[in-house]
Structures are given as C-alpha cells and as structure tokens.
Design a protein with these regions (language model features):
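Amphipathic alpha-helical segments used for helix-helix packing
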Residues: 90, 103-127
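Hydrophobic alpha-helical connector segments
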Residues: 64, 78-108, 159-165, 190, ...
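Short coil/turn segments at alpha/beta junctions that flank glycine-rich nucleotide-binding fingerprints
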Residues: 29-33, 84, 105, 150
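Helix-turn-helix
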Residues: 18, 22-60, 64
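Amphipathic alpha-helical linker/stalk segments
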Residues: 3-7, 21, 29, 65-94
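Amphipathic alpha-helical interface segments
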Residues: 22, 26, 97, 168-175
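Hydrophobic/aromatic residues within well-ordered alpha-helical segments
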Residues: 15, 58, 65, 69, ...
Length: 227
C-alpha cells in the first residue's frame, strides 16, 4: 500500500507535465486567445474534467506553462554556459540555445509573445515574466563580470550590459519573426546576434562614434569566432 501511495504523487506530477506540454503545443500553434481547455485535453488524450482536476482554469494552466518555460530556459542557459570556459564562448553558447532551429524558435516565440501580452495586463503573468528576465540577466551578468575580469570585455556597467544583451537577443528574434522567409533568414539573424553581442561587449561603453571595434583588444577573437 505504501508503494502505491508513493507512486500517486509521481503520477500526478507526470500528468501535470503532460498537460503543460500539450498546452505549449496548442498555444504555439493557435495563440492564447484561440486555445481552449478542450483543445489541450484532446492534445493530452484526457478529458476536460481531468484537466480541471489538475488546473483550476485555462489561465491557471497557462500561467503554470509560462513558469515551466521560464524554469526550462534558465536550466538550459546554465547548462550551456557551464559547458564552456571563456566568456566569448559562453556568449556563443547562449546564442546557440536561443537560436536552435527555425521551427523551435517559431513555436517558442509565438507562445512567448502571447505571454508578454498577458503579462502587461495580469499580475500573475507579469511576475513570471519578471522572474524570466531577472534570471536571464543574472546569467548574462556573470558572463560579463568574467569577461571584464579577464580583460576580454570593456563594458563599464555589468547591470546595464546584461540588460543590453537581453535587448539584442529579443530585438533580433522579433525582427526574425517578421521575416517572410523564416527558414532562409534564420542563420543570418543567429550569426548577427552573436556578432553584435560580442562587438558590444568588447567595445562596451568605451566605444565612440567612428571607432572600429576591430581595433579593440580581443576583437580579433570575436571576428574569427563569428566567422
């Protein structure tokens, strides 16, 4: 009996995860407004009643989905940067997991844009979005600090640099989503993201109008790595 009872929470955790993943696929395909609990239940091969047993409402389920995505992203980011040593390599590792493939990026950012819209209107989603960016900036800041300590990066403000890194990631990703040919343009945006991040970090606040990043220390490594 004890063994059976011990397995119940495990089964419930697994069922919740299955429903969350089903919700992600539905939102990525249809958008938040069009997705229903019936759609999610059908995707997970359960009844709507089962879905409501685990989540009180569609909004509750999608907020949990958003939180799950945030946790997953932070985990992948940490794994990526821990597998490399140099600051520039860590930046490249972040770009690689941020731009994995056209299909994965399209699915994720369609869902993410919906969640950002919800965060502007609903506190529960806003809190999750704040946690997302706080965690990303923390990881980015550690990379910046390491790069500055080694003399590879010349930014003066670690907090501002981490925020700017996020702006480059998000800005280029949003522009890519607006392209008519996502497949063909994908590699261009991924390469540009890597190049702009490293150029910014190497030049940092010391960069002046008309200055050439190639003249900065460490720029040769940036250019060779980006190519």
């Amino acid at each position: 009996v004890a063994q059976v009872n011990a397995r119940v929470p495990e089964r419930e955790v697994q069922r919740r995860l299955e429903l969350v993943k089903a919700a992600y696929r539905e939102v990525a395909e249809k958008g938040f407004a069009e997705v229903t609990l019936d759609d999610i239940a059908r995707r997970a091969s359960v009844s709507k009643g089962v879905t409501l047993y685990y989540f009180s409402s569609k909004e509750d389920l999608l907020r949990r989905l958003f939180a799950w995505l945030v946790d997953s992203i932070h985990e992948r980011m940490r794994e990526a940067v821990s597998s490399t040593s140099g600051p520039a390599e860590k930046v490249r590792a972040l770009v690689a997991i941020t731009f994995p493939s056209p299909s994965k990026n399209r699915a994720f950012f369609r869902a993410f844009v919906d969640f950002c819209g919800l965060a502007a209107r609903r506190d529960g989603f806003r809190e999750v979005l704040e946690r997302f960016y706080r965690g990303c900036r923390e990881i980015d800041r550690e990379i910046v600090r390491d790069g500055v300590r080694r003399g590879d990066f010349r930014v003066r403000d670690e907090e501002a640099a981490a925020s700017t890194m996020r702006a480059i990631f998000d800005g280029l990703m949003m522009q890519w989503l607006a392209e008519s040919d996502l497949e063909t343009s994908f590699s261009t945006y991924r390469e540009r993201c890597e190049l702009e991040l490293l150029r910014y970090l190497v030049a940092g606040s010391d960069r002046r109008r008309g200055s050439d990043p190639a003249t900065k220390p460490g720029a040769a490594a940036v250019e060779s790595g980006a190519g």
